[in-house]
């Protein structure tokens, strides 16, 4: 069953990679439409990866020799996972990072050998540095990719802008400013009240990427703190239930899905308060379509 889910995931990712559509003004084609329904294949891939990795580790948990067989690693674990990662990342770097981070969390909980994890970390870090260096050395070679967007967002976050931002990143900068303004307004009493936000008219993704700041503006900083508290309670409850599960597969699936949800929540709130560069992550359970 996990192989069927993974193959379906790879198929939809290929579809989005080749002919993905744009929804809500986002520049990256992350969506596909099937029978009139639109969805992001990357979200489906996160679930597929969690189940796939959990099944592999559960299957070979008592036989380390088979688990570390190069043939099995290439065909039954790393190959499909890396293929999904490569298909996700060009259109959605933040989801790609959540994908690979969650994968490593599952490996750690599943007692995958640390030596292999550290080696793969080193390879990923080296690849990232090489990509960054290659872009800085020859930006024109990456003009038709999203690499300039990624680098610009990181550079503009850590270094004061030199006025050379693209139109897309200027829009993102304005949205972050509006989000911070909404949070600042929400820090005062009384708050704007339900449905009475002003900054939502300046945020093109007010109901998704910046919903947290709008909620703070409408329900005050207390409302924002309550939302964060709900996620903390959710984390504690799922963690307790995960370690009550008797089989390794169930434990890894619960921990993996929890990791995905909490990564999205942390990144979303971090972007809204200006702590991390702009991404396109929704607030789980709350954002429109989240």
Segments and roles (model prediction):
Residues 1-171, 213-271:
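Hydrophobic alpha-helical transmembrane segments of multi-pass inner membrane proteins, especially
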Residues 99, 195-199, 230, 272-282:
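Re-entrant/interfacial helical elements at transmembrane boundaries that shape
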């Amino acid at each position: 069953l996990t192989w069927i889910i993974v193959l379906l995931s790879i198929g939809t990712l290929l579809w989005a990679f080749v002919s993905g559509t744009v929804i809500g003004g986002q520049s990256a084609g992350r969506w596909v439409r099937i029978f009139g329904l639109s969805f992001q294949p990357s979200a489906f891939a996160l679930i597929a990866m969690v189940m796939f990795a959990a099944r592999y580790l559960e299957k070979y948990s008592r036989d380390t020799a088979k688990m570390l067989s190069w043939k099995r690693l290439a065909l039954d674990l790393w190959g499909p996972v890396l293929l999904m990662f490569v298909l996700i990342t060009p259109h959605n770097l933040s989801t790609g990072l959540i994908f690979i981070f969650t994968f490593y969390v599952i490996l750690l909980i599943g007692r995958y050998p640390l030596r292999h994890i550290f080696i793969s970390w080193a390879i990923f870090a080296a690849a990232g540095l090489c990509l960054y260096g290659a872009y800085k050395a020859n930006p024109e070679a990456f003009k038709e990719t999203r690499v300039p967007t990624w680098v610009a967002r990181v550079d503009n976050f850590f270094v004061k802008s030199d006025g050379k931002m693209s139109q897309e990143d200027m829009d993102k900068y304005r949205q972050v400013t509006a989000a911070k303004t909404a949070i600042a307004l929400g820090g005062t009493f009384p708050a704007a009240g339900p449905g009475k936000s002003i900054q939502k008219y300046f945020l093109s993704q007010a109901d998704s990427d910046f919903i947290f700041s709008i909620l703070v503006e409408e329900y005050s900083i207390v409302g924002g703190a309550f939302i964060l508290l709900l996620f903390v309670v959710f984390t504690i409850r799922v963690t307790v239930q995960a370690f009550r599960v008797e089989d390794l597969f169930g434990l890894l699936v619960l921990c993996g899905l929890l990791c995905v949800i909490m990564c999205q929540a942390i990144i979303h709130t971090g972007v809204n308060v200006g702590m991390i560069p702009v991404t396109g992550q929704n607030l789980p359970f709350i954002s429109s379509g989240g």
